[in-house]
């Protein structure tokens, strides 16, 4: 074996032995696996000022809940380990995402107060056709314009559809296949106790005691109680000119989210549209949920949420994002204390890249009840807030 001059010099002084150098040079399976593993994550912080006299807000994600108003917040600290799968081979990998902080408490993978496994799955590739990719374990939902990680969204606050209608995650198996450069498909099956937006914040309405987690109720569900999902995505090719990169996404999720009394079906449609103005991007999403066939408190109920997105890159470092929403339901999905509700929402966000690896944003959000019922926001029809968000990514 050939040693470099520094190794020989260290061996001469007794700092290392040539035997240990030989051993260190040998390939070990553990070292080989770790060499392709990446560590990443972020720290998500915010400060929110509610412009009203109270703290009652619309049912959005935890990072803008009533307990985050008028103060400083550490929302999430996330650590991620991942070994991606290789192209074109019988390849294997994995992903583990762990969340720490108050946002973790609402996730389906919550282990204890302030800790959750957001994702934890084995990734497998079968080189059949263009390659079939499998995720086995806990994985993110296949529907939704927005995601749990705030920095990856156009706005800091989440849409009404994200929090109230869409799943936060599934535990099961998901298969994905890229038919060609334009069309991709996926299909999966998961446990029936996975978090589902319809009942995610309303366990009592689904017939179970408040405070019970989905996993604790698995023994109460039928063996056939599963969630089924599928999606199709169509992307415009480079030959489409200025439309290149645009996409149309259609997905559906059906399953017994929290027991046999409810049978929700969610249809999701999302569009991301490039424009002839390269600085301008457009998007839209629709979440349509119907709890057909159920006999419980939510049997036959519906909920719909629509969102329209506009993004404009003002300068190299400054970007503006706007989201307008309209949502309605037959069971009070979006507003506190409602049996039926209608709400409009307007969110405007400025993103300025001041520091490397740091996302710095300021956001104005306005929610207004338009169903004609009692004023839901501490006696007011409107809820307005200002948010400063800083996220460090590594």
Where are these regions (language model features)?
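Gram-negative bacterial Sec-dependent N-terminal signal peptides
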Residues: 1-24
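Outer-membrane beta-barrel "beta-signal"
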Residues: 232, 352-357, 380-394
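Outer membrane beta-barrel
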Residues: 26-195, 201, 224-229, 233-240, ...
């Amino acid at each position: 074996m050939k040693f470099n001059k520094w190794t020989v010099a260290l061996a001469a002084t007794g700092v290392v032995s040539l035997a240990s150098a030989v051993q260190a040079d040998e390939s070990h399976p553990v070292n080989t696996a770790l060499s392709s593993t990446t560590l990443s994550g972020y720290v998500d912080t915010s400060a929110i000022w509610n412009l009203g006299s109270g703290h009652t807000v619309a049912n959005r994600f935890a990072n803008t809940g009533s307990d985050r108003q008028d103060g400083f917040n550490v929302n999430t600290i996330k650590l991620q380990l991942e070994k991606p799968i290789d192209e074109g081979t019988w390849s294997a990998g994995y992903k583990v995402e762990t969340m720490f902080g108050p946002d973790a408490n609402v996730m389906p993978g919550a282990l204890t107060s302030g800790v959750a496994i957001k994702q934890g799955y084995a990734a497998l590739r079968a080189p059949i056709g263009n390659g079939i990719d499998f995720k086995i374990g806990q994985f993110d939902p296949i529907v939704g314009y927005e995601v749990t990680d705030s920095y990856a969204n156009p706005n800091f606050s989440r849409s009404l559809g994200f929090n109230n209608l869409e799943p936060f995650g599934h535990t099961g198996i998901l298969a994905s296949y890229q038919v060609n450069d334009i069309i991709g498909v996926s299909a999966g099956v998961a446990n029936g106790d996975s978090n589902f937006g319809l009942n995610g914040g309303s366990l009592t309405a689904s017939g179970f005691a408040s405070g019970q987690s989905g996993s604790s109720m698995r023994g109460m569900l039928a063996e056939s109680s599963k969630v089924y999902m599928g999606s199709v995505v169509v992307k415009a090719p480079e030959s489409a000119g200025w439309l290149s990169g645009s996409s149309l996404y259609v997905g559906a999720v059906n399953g017994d989210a929290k027991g046999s009394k409810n049978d929700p079906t969610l249809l999701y449609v999302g569009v991301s549209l490039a424009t002839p103005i390269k600085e301008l991007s457009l998007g839209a999403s629709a979440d349509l949920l119907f709890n057909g066939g159920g006999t419980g408190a939510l049997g036959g109920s519906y909920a719909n949420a629509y969102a329209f997105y506009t993004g404009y890159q003002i300068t190299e470092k400054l970007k503006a994002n706007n989201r307008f929403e309209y949502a309605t339901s037959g069971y009070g999905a979006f507003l506190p204390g409602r049996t039926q509700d209608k709400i409009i929402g307007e969110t405007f966000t400025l993103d300025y890249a001041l520091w490397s690896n740091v996302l710095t944003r300021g956001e104005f959000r306005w929610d207004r009840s338009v169903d004609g019922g009692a004023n839901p926001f501490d006696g007011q029809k409107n809820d307005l807030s200002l948010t400063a968000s800083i996220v460090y990514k590594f």
